[in-house]
């Protein structure tokens, strides 16, 4: 087994575009190459940048640790049929809790939700029953599961910060679905996302928790903020894919015969590859004028090619390592 290791010192600015006023523009030092182990990759100079924090938390994480003596447990079980549907899609929009999706050879969807409510009083428990609901939308070939409540807003992320309501409702989703299904699933707090045995496209998001995917044969995006991202492919992706975290390692496992173009970003971490790679040229910096401002979109990715190249696979993190490994399972 040949493992290629190349240390990187990529910058925080590589994660976000930099906006400068026309009066405050100063010359940017030309990036200088650094000698590192094979393959040789040029490392960019650091630039200051301000990192926006995620704004998707419905309540603070500490709310779940409050003294909430009144508790209630409930199990929701339902089944749905995708028989005869030419295209199958699943969407889950959770807030508190985990998500597990496992592919099967059946056309049926088996849903189990373990709902746990913790409240300050019986009145608050009754309030939680009324305010927090699981909305289910079933159409031809499409199943949507949406956790609704007073924490929801009409912003792009679907939830916003509110004062503590006096209760916390956690829903853990477990689903058995057809293998050839496209999935869009996300959660925010107190849960991990696990996906196994899926052949379709995927969009997987988390905030405070890890993402683990195994035996995957599709292409897509997996992103979290606080936690690792681990994906093992049964069949290498045929289309562009994207994997990202801020605090955690990213570990991707591919089968033999991998041919792809990788573009990496990391700040505090190293990049490892089981596959021999060759360096790709650095892409040009893009400059955009917006009135009195000049916005620089600098491509600070480290680009490498595996074999003859193929779909572009982007991998980003801030604090953690990136590992590109060969899947022997």
Question: Where would I find each of the regions flagged by the language model?
Answer:
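Intrinsically disordered, low-complexity terminal regions
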Residues: 2-329
């Amino acid at each position: 087994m040949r493992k290629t290791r190349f240390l990187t010192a990529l910058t925080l600015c590589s994660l976000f575009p930099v906006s400068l006023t026309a009066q405050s523009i100063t010359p940017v030092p030309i990036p200088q190459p650094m000698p590192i182990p094979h393959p040789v990759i040029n490392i960019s100079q650091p630039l200051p940048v301000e990192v926006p924090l995620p704004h998707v938390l419905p309540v603070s994480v500490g709310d779940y640790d409050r003294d909430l003596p009144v508790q209630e447990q409930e199990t929701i079980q339902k089944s749905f049929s995708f028989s005869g549907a030419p295209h199958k899609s699943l969407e889950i929009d959770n807030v508190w809790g985990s998500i597990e999706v496992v592919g099967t050879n059946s056309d049926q969807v088996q849903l189990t939700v373990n709902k746990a409510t913790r409240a300050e009083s019986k009145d608050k428990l009754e309030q939680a029953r009324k305010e927090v609901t699981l909305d289910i939308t079933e159409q031809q070939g499409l199943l949507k599961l949406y956790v609704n409540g007073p924490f929801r807003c009409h912003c792009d992320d679907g939830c916003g910060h509110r004062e503590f309501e006096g209760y916390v409702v956690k829903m853990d989703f477990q689903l058995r679905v057809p293998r050839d299904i496209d999935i869009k699933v996300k959660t925010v707090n107190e849960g991990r996302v696990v996906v196994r045995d899926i052949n379709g496209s995927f969009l997987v998001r988390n905030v405070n928790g890890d993402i683990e995917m195994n035996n995957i044969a599709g292409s897509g995006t997996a992103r979290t903020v606080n936690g690792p991202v681990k994906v093992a492919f049964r069949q290498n992706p045929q289309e562009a894919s994207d994997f990202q975290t801020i605090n955690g390692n990213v570990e991707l496992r591919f089968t033999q015969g991998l041919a792809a173009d990788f573009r990496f970003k990391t700040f505090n971490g190293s990049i490892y590859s089981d596959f021999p790679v060759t360096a790709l040229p650095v892409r040009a910096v893009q400059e955009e004028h917006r009135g009195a401002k000049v916005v620089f979109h600098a491509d600070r990715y480290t680009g490498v090619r595996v074999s003859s190249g193929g779909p572009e696979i982007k991998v980003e993190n801030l604090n953690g390592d990136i590992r590109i490994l060969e899947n022997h399972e």
